[in-house]
């Protein structure tokens, strides 16, 4: 079963696709808890041994606002389907069932205003049903957190506190770059105006939210901008100084993973071309030229890899740079059960929380995103907008490659919308349409289909500097997104965006 507001290729292959309303995943998770707990379907033995806060969560989830009927109104998923899903999920793997329940969480759930709460709520489901006890059960988002690299040795926070300015350096959230470049230093107590921008490993002119403010800030005459890049990206066009960067083939690094449990070293295939310098070499030399005399500015890749692997965590026991260079990849030394299987969170020993258990506190509370259909009737923008990732690009990376452009051509510059919304606006497939809100607008071609539900429209982040919207403006979906941050972690809220759509001029290209 796939739960997604968009009918993805994965959803099309699933036994069942639930087209949930954007930003309502926390409500669905709490609705599933309501059914599980009201029917006493939780694994009481596991809950008692491995969780903290069960009674508080139980009382909260059994509130009327999380009944299947209430949750159905928020999520758009039928109450009967919610009950059926909860019962099937709780039963999987138990009472002789051969297939345990596993949840494959992905990153999209986090990109809503309540995304942190949503992710927490979903993660509580296997804590209630005990599906962690079964091989193949539980939940996966990413295995990246399983690699206990010594981040403190790499980040050196004590040097930040020893700033010659007498205070810690100001931190600006990268998802609020537009605000930082246009509003910081405007006379409030948020510090001085940003006067220099150093961009590496990113293309904020294309991928940062609230694109119009980002570009307005980058066009400031008094902003000194340095861009360290491999290609002439959107951001490179705004650089006062453009420095050549190597590709991953030209640098050495230690690697964790998103989906496996092997530590690796990636060696250089070739030396850096031309004058390209790695991040390590560039910032080391820059630090020296700025007068810093700490030894860390002389560290190079081998020294940093050694520092990253130097930790007391037993999962890295016996894993050294020399061994990784010799063997290529080495499995993490994780605990195994009597059968030799790794069963994470199957016992309380796995939880590295203050209580030593899976935390159910504070209880998750569903609140609809400010920009969502729950509030759409209050303003001029009634449609929820999904700025989807392209299948053949990584954000804006690879968007300059003709082969990838050809593979993306079918949905490039396209707005997908439901027939109900299209008919209400007298829009047909192929029409030029303007998608707009108070932050900006883009021109696209309409594609009327059933990939989205009524009230939802979708378009892909599929332009680099080599492309533009239909009006000829170099704008993409981020002209519409906001700099509002998620409730946990301060992430971007790309999927909490309201828009309106109107038919455009026929003479746009």
Where are these regions (language model features)?
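Extended redox/cofactor-interaction regions of prokaryotic respiratory oxidoreductases
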Residues: 1, 26-30, 73, 123-238, ...
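Long, well-ordered, tryptophan-enriched scaffold segments
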Residues: 6-98
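Flexible glycine/proline-rich, aromatic-decorated loop/lid segments
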Residues: 6-9, 232-266
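Flexible glycine/proline-enriched surface loops and loop-helix/loop-strand junctions
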Residues: 13-14, 53, 64-70, 104-109, ...
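Flexible, glycine/charged-enriched surface loops at secondary-structure junctions
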Residues: 42-47, 98-102, 133-140, 294-301
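A glycine-rich phosphate-binding loop feature that marks nucleotide/adenosyl-phosphate handling sites
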Residues: 49-52, 106-108, 138-148, 299-313, ...
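Phosphate/diphosphate-binding loops
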Residues: 214, 220-224, 228-231, 265-288, ...
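Long, contiguous, secondary-structure-rich segments that constitute the structural scaffold
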Residues: 273, 279-327, 401-416, 420-509
């Amino acid at each position: 079963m796939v739960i997604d507001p968009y009918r993805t290729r994965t959803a099309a292959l699933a036994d069942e696709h639930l087209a949930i309303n954007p930003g309502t995943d926390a409500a669905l998770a709490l609705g599933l808890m309501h059914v599980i707990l009201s029917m006493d379907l939780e694994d009481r033995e596991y809950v008692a041994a491995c969780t903290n806060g069960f009674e508080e969560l139980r009382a909260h989830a059994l509130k009327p606002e999380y009944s299947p009927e209430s949750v159905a109104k928020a999520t758009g998923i039928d109450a009967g389907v919610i009950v059926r899903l909860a019962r099937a999920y709780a039963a999987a793997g138990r009472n002789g069932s051969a297939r345990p329940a596993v949840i494959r969480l992905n990153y999209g759930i986090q990109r809503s205003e309540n995304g942190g709460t949503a992710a927490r709520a979903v993660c509580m489901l296997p804590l209630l049903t005990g599906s962690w006890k079964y091989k193949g059960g539980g939940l996966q988002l990413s295995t990246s957190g399983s690699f206990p690299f010594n981040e403190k040795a790499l980040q050196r926070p004590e040097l930040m506190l020893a700033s010659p300015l007498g205070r810690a350096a100001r931190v600006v959230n990268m998802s609020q770059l537009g605000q930082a470049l246009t509003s910081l230093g405007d006379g409030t107590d948020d510090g001085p105006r940003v006067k220099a921008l150093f961009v590496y490993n990113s293309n904020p002119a294309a991928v940062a939210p609230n694109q119009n403010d980002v570009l307005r800030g980058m066009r400031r005459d008094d902003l000194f901008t340095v861009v360290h890049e491999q290609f002439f990206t959107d951001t490179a066009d705004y650089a006062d100084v453009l420095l050549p960067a190597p590709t991953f083939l030209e640098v050495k690094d230690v690697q964790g993973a998103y989906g496996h449990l092997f530590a690796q070293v990636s060696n250089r295939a070739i030396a850096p071309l031309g004058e390209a310098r790695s991040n390590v070499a560039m910032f080391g030399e820059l630090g020296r030229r700025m007068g810093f005399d700490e030894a860390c500015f002389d560290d190079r890749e081998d020294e940093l890899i050694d520092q990253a692997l130097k930790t007391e965590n037993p999962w890295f026991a016996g894993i050294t740079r020399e061994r990784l260079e010799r063997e290529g990849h080495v499995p993490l030394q994780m605990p195994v059960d009597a059968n030799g299987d790794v069963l994470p969170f199957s016992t309380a020993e796995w939880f590295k929380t203050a209580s030593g258990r899976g935390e159910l506190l504070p209880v998750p509370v569903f609140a609809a995103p400010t920009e969502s259909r729950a509030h759409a009737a209050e303003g001029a923008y009634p449609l929820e907008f999904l700025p989807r990732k392209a299948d053949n690009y990584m954000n804006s990376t690879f968007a300059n490659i003709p082969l990838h452009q050809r593979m993306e051509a079918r949905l490039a510059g396209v707005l997908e919308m439901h027939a109900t919304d299209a008919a209400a606006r007298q829009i047909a497939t192929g029409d030029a349409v303007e998608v707009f809100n108070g932050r900006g607008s883009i021109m696209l071609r309409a594609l009327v289909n059933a990939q989205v539900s009524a009230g939802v429209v979708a378009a892909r982040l599929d332009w680099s500097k080599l492309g533009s919207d239909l009006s000829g403006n170099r704008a993409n979906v981020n002209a519409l997104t906001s700099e509002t941050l998620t409730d946990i972690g301060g992430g971007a809220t790309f999927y909490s965006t309201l828009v309106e759509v109107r038919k455009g001029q026929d003479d746009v290209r």
